[in-house]
Amino acid sequence: ASNKESYGARRKFLLGEELDSVMYYVFRNAILDFCRGGDAKYVMNQIMSVIENYPRPVLRVLMNSLSTHDTERALTVIAGEPLNGRDRQWQANQKLSYDQRKRGIALLKLAVGMQYTLPGFPCVYYGDEAGLEGYRDPFNRCCYPWGREDKELIEWDKALGNLRKSCSPLWDGDFLNVTPGKNYLSYIR
């Protein structure tokens, strides 16, 4: 996206002074895949591909989103059944069970931890910090759950935001991949 080719021409969306940032969908897909049990080495290769090929000023401003208005909610992706092209009627009737949600919240906290510590900046889609779930539009765009927020998740996001604010290597530091194998993802900032 920093120097994208589309419609037969090189586009300079970010480095051409048109946009301040771009959506970092590689990050989203890699992190959610890892949280669903994906291979850590593969996930880190996806992340490293961006780190090695994007200029540092671009890396610093990549939008690290786990959910957007164009995607399923992260909690649903991590803990729910895969969408697999199912229709809107199926999506409308899906809700995580208590056990799915409990496991999903734990995995979402892991994903959010990576969202706040990988290169780029955390871009939280409204309601993710409160535990909203949902498949594709319009199910990912429900109202914010005022008074029913997952307070543990909100406190987790706040703590990570404060950590990032107080620790400059998290927003301007180097990145060292120390992932040892396919089961563990690790890096140093």
Question: What is each PLM-predicted segment?
Answer:
Residues 1-62, 114, 133-162:
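Active-site-proximal helices and loops of the catalytic beta/alpha 8
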Residues 3-7, 43-48, 105-107, 125-128, ...:
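Short amphipathic alpha-helical surface micro-motifs
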Residues 11-14, 64-96, 112-151:
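Aromatic/acidic polysaccharide-binding cleft in carbohydrate-active enzymes
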Residues 41-44, 48-50, 84-109, 162:
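Aromatic-anchored helix/helix-loop segment that forms the rim or "lid"
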Residues 51-54, 112-114, 182-189:
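Short, surface-exposed beta-strand/loop micro-motifs that present aromatic residues
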Residues 54-58, 72-73, 118-122, 164-171:
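Short secondary-structure junctions and interdomain/linker hinges
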Residues 103-104, 115, 176-177:
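Short Gly/Pro-enriched turn/cap motifs at secondary-structure boundaries
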Residues 124-126, 130-189:
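Glycan-recognition and catalytic regions of carbohydrate-active enzymes
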